[in-house]
Amino acid sequence: MNAPALRLVPDASPHSTRSTATSEDPALRPVSFDDYIGQTEVIANLRQSVRAAKRGGWQLDHMLFAGPAGVGKTSLAGVIAAELGGKLHVTSAPAIEHKGQLATLLATLGEGDVLFIDELHAFKREISEVLYLAMEDRVIDMPAGKRVIRIQLPKFTLLGATTHAGKLPKPLLDRFGFVWQLRLYTLDEMTTIVSRSAGKLGMPMDAEGATTIARASRGTPRIANRLLRRVRDYTGGADVQGGLVPVHLVIGEGIAQAALAQLGIDHRGLDSLDRRYLALVADRPVGIEAICAELAEDRSTIEDAIEPWLMQAGLIKRGGKGRLATEAGRGHLAEVG
């Protein structure tokens, strides 16, 4: 039997700010509810539930976090585990290829552990069914030759994350005690996150510089932290007007804008692919399949990575005939050329 696809630190090395994999410096992640910025109502409810579970001596209910990629679902799982004092195990549904892998993973859990499964919607139905008994009765059935052995699991909390809650089987969805919807962040929240992360990265930055990067971060902390690292690269090696930018220079609006421009990112966080999308739908409604063909991108990239921010920013709208740029979207195209 293959070893379970399990890791304690969810990390990857994406090649662009559009990747859905996490690449953040662990030092940038919040470590407590007090340290977590944004998602105020969700945090208030979670704080209350965790406090009650600790005081009452019961295990925290299983929870599902739904929302766009990069808005803090993995970070929130880490905070919950830390607040509970339990060990966090992290995996993703695409990494689990058959039922035996998931059963083996569940069998490794200890009393009070927290299991975080990302991209829960990607489970094959027969694999997700293994979770039903585990979540409801804390048991799993393990094959042993021609027999099946039922194994009792310790008390644990499953935290699931998805960008497509509607794709989850209803029996799985119904087994979560809470379903929380995480949203994109406001400009004020993003500015606070950028300022805090810049401090942790040792990057002197003024308020205007933080706001400039926050505006380009598409309401997503993960993107903000990646952009910060690229700005750090820029200040450490860019040639500006015949000389290098001093590494310890305070990063203001001008340097932030120059670094973003070098990356091809405009002041609203749009890159060349976003602008190509916007130009494609500027004059008439276009269906999703035609957009995918024209941009040579798969549907999940269009729907998960491009459209959420364009809609949040009021640059496009979706209707029965397809996607169409708004007046603001056409204005943005005219502004950036």
Listing of model-derived features with the role each one plays in the protein:
Residues 211-216, 222-237, 276-279, 290, ...:
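C-terminal helical "lid" of AAA+/P-loop NTPase domains
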